[in-house]
Amino acid sequence: MLKRLLSKLTGNRQQIEHHLKNQYQVEENGLSFPLSLVDDSQLWALASWLEQLAEEDYLISLTDRWLLSWDALYRLLEDEEHASSLPLIGVPDVLPLRASLSSRGALSDSDFRVWIAEWATLPARKPIRFSRTGAILTHENQQYLLSRENWALLQATEQLSAQKNQTPGETTNQLGWAAIRKCAKQAAAKFDDYLEKTHVVKPTSLSLRLRKATVADTAVIEIEPHFEDQPANWLGSFDKNSQVHDSYRIPGENGELSHVIIPPEVKEVLNSIHSIPSRRVAGSEALSFVRNPYTFLGEDAASVIAPEEHEQALFDARIFFHHFRLIPQLNAENKIAEVTLVLEPVSPVPQPEITFGFSAPRELDKFIQQLGISVAAQMPAGSWQGYELELSQFTEQQWHDCQALLTRWQQEIEGKEFSDVLDIAKYGDRVIGIGEFEKISSPWLTKAQSENWLPDDIDFSAFSVETLSGWQPENLHHFDELQERITQAEAVGETHITAPWNDSQLPLDAAKTFSKNWEKQQSTANESQGNVADKTARAVLKIEQNIEETAYIKQRRNSLLNARHAEPEIPLSLKEHIRLKDHQREGVAWLQQLFLRSPEETAGCLLADDMGLGKTLQILSFLVWFIEKFPQEPPSLIVAPVSLLDNWERELDNFFYTAGIPVLKLYGETIKAVKYPKQAIPAHLQSQGIKNLLKPGWQGEAKIILTTYETLRDQEFSLARQPWSIMVCDEAQKIKNPAALITHAANAVQARFKVACTGTPVENTLVDLWSLFDFAQPGLLGALNEFGKHYVRPIENEDGRDTERLESLRALIEPQTLRRTKEEVARDLPQKIEVESCKQLTLSGVQKQLYLSSVANWQQQQALSEGMQQAGTGMLGLLHRLKLICAHPAVVNPEPRFRDNSPKLNWLLKILAELKHTTKDKVIIFTELRDLQRELQHAIHQKFGFRPVIINGDTSTKSQSQNSRQRLIDDFQAQPGFGVIILSTVAVGFGVNVQKANHVIHFTRCWNPAKEDQATDRAYRIGQTKDVYVYYPTVKDTEITTFEETLDDLLQRRRALARDMLCATPDLSGADFEAILKGA
């Protein structure tokens, strides 16, 4: 189906298939391709693609051939990034078939058997006979491919037969029929009467349905376990039995019988739930369960219950944790008349605040006493009147403030006043009065913004301009209808569906790809936002400020801003050949100075240096210095995504002598040695919901402990009780969601100094920044609701950014934020030079003809759409097509005249030839278009005799893989002299550093200038010794303004605006391109 679609788009199906027919052999295990294809000049495109598939682990390399297994083939057919390449192998069309299943015996019988009795065509449902090799069947001398669902069904039936020969018995029959039934339902197969009424369910995951009630001011929560295809009467059997069984038989209506098989890991979680009387928890148990079910339900819960499922269950049950504050209401005599308790729900969706009024001190006293019980027990949460209170961030000072408020009110009622509360002489010599806090401002800071546009990973070219007419990304009704029509078509074997937005016919596979990308776009757009609420301003002690002039000097208590001007203390363990750059020395000194002022003057900081400036080395230098200077102090904790933890350990070994720096990896297999088995945890702790604990002394002699965010969440009772000197959260975007369990666990950890480390502190909204500072310096930015009203709304206002409010926020966080860009540290780096001459490439004649015909087609569609009030539709597909035409017209039309008249390709080959014969420098070519990648690879091979490596997001990252991403890059960098590597602009993530290349060619442009600069930074970073030359080849025309010319202008104007870390990245509007489309 995809082959027909793509051949239609290119218009060259017969020509392609003529050269490629019979280039594979059908085997039982898959399709095989001879390695000799590489030597056939007529088949270079196929050979190049097969090499790509081998690099991405689709193909198995054998001694004389490549093997594409059937499972890999089906994955490939669903991979939209390879969709345009499928005609290269000419896979047969899928033959829609419906299987009819028959059985013999019952599940309890030793001779129980299930087989496919008949195949019938769809939609005619006529019986059909055929021969088959693997997933390829032959009918009437024509080859077809089984659908993925029918192939899975066929394998499941064969697997049951094989298992019965090895381990016969009822359990084998049950598990085998469960697997077959699941595949049969997906394939819309037909069952005989016995199979229709016999269900087998083996749940591998659970969801929890929660119901909350308040009984005598105490929250009571009922827990109901649920799994997919759960029989209606299963929960009754679960509750009725005294223990959890390995299997259940649940009778149903009309003679149906369901077999439920419980795997060990699911049984362990169900045992925990079953041990709860009536499946109800109350009081402290309810708090522990709601806040973190993983510590309550045991070590297997994390693999059985998905975090998002639990968070959704809490939301559905309207169960929220609440930040709280006490607000005194003063009368005309400045005395307390009453106190209001304000509860702010922590939720990704804004919820109304809840308030309680205390009219007398005794009422407030009850609240403080109940709060004190939770605080004394060091519990991360408490409760009041059935509402859950978040205490992970509740400080000792806040506790004292609550007590002081009660004491003041009691004394006022008794007619007593503090005699010295307003006496300034009672305070330090820097205090000059009492009043509202005055925010610090800095006049040299400037406003900037960044913009983003269409997502690069959505390919709109699968549909024509007419097909996309009427499509609106925000129309979720159309999205739901599209998914429903896809499901219906799959069930009955239809090959096409009707588009909900204009009734055009869509190939099913292309529609599924489009739906998947549309869903990704919605998920990105719908990330959770913070709540917004008021917060009453409070009085503070005014102090002398040293911003505009030095108003107060006292050497033993310097301003936090002075920390930037200190000299670093370089750790003795730093290896002799390692020399810190100037900006790294400044960063280490800044961290050291802030730490020395903690905890009295600061609780933590945000290290937000630009990518490639060595944040890891700075933090490691800081940590090693601390270990050397304070050897008796508690250890330090580094929390990072699991993919980065090995890099932390590797860089520690590379840069430092680590003999005196013991490190513990608290994740993966190593955690088992220091973790209590569940049965060893005392019953009184388990009764309170504490079922995950580390053994006493688990940290050993370690001075640095590495762990994951997930371990931090699951082991919070141990990690939060351990005093830490320094806690580092790397890639701190992981704690940007205030409502996530991981964020709560991070905030619960007691550390003298916390460091949030991220190059992108604001990704989607300023709430990201609030959450980071809620970790590093709680209360600095106020309550989340206050922050939303005071900063997020005016700064992110669509009608215009409030620059005064933006600068106020910048000044507020400046003392605890360090952000340097490469421009600011250029003295320590080679130059980055943009080559302007390549921006004057002339659009070729045939290229211009193809360009104008595409625009004319779109303009004609616009004229037809205006009467339907749909003007502007289809623009996304057109813009993508214009991007392809400008880059290399042969990607749109492979006729020789288009390949021979490609100005950008001709320019590329010319500049590469100059570099090869002069400087012999290495070159990176960036483009995310896979078809274009192969065209460039082939052209370079034809010109220079070697095939440059291509690396995309799917290239393996496993270190043991022969074609791993890092190994390919290392090989490229190790080869002497001239070389070329082709990278995807949007796939250059962690670990892709190519400092040996110093020429960066953006053959196609990214819609986002920040991503484009990040791609360039793969070469322009610490370790680069040569000037880096950056090329943006652009085709122009004397009569029309081209797409590339307009895009280059937009990106250039936005590049400088994209550097402010406080600015989120809104999307560009398609209106920016309307002028060139209407004028072409």
UniProtKB/Swiss-Prot annotation:
One annotated GO molecular function is:
helicase activity
The record's section on Gene3D superfamilies has: P-loop containing nucleotide triphosphate hydrolases (3.40.50.300), Tandem AAA-ATPase domain (3.40.50.10810)
Q: Pfam families, alphabetically?
A: Helicase_C, SNF2-rel_dom
The residue stretches assigned to a coiled coil in this entry are: none
Q: Which UniProt keywords apply?
A: Antiviral defense, ATP-binding, Helicase, Hydrolase, Nucleotide-binding
Domain Helicase ATP-binding residue range list: 596-779
**What happens in the null mutant?**
When this gene is missing the Zorya system does not confer resistance to SECphi27 in E.coli.
What PROSITE patterns would the database entry show? HELICASE_ATP_BIND_1, HELICASE_CTER
Q: Which residues form the Helicase C-terminal domain?
A: 904-1069
Q: Which GO terms describe its biological process?
A: defense response to virus
Q: What does this protein do?
A: Component of antiviral defense system Zorya type I, composed of ZorA, ZorB, ZorC and ZorD. Expression of Zorya type I in E.coli (strain MG1655) confers 10,000-fold resistance to phage SECphi27, 100-fold resistance to lambda, and 10-fold resistance to T7. While most T7 infected Zorya-containing cells undergo abortive infection, a minority produce viable phage progeny. These eventually accumulate to a high multiplicity of infection, leading to culture collapse by 2 hours after initial infection. ZorA and ZorB probably assemble in the cell inner membrane and exert their effect there.
PANTHER family on file = DNA EXCISION REPAIR PROTEIN ERCC-6-RELATED, SNF2/RAD54 FAMILY MEMBER
State what protein this is by name. Zorya protein ZorD
Species the sequence originates in: Escherichia coli O139:H28 (strain E24377A / ETEC)
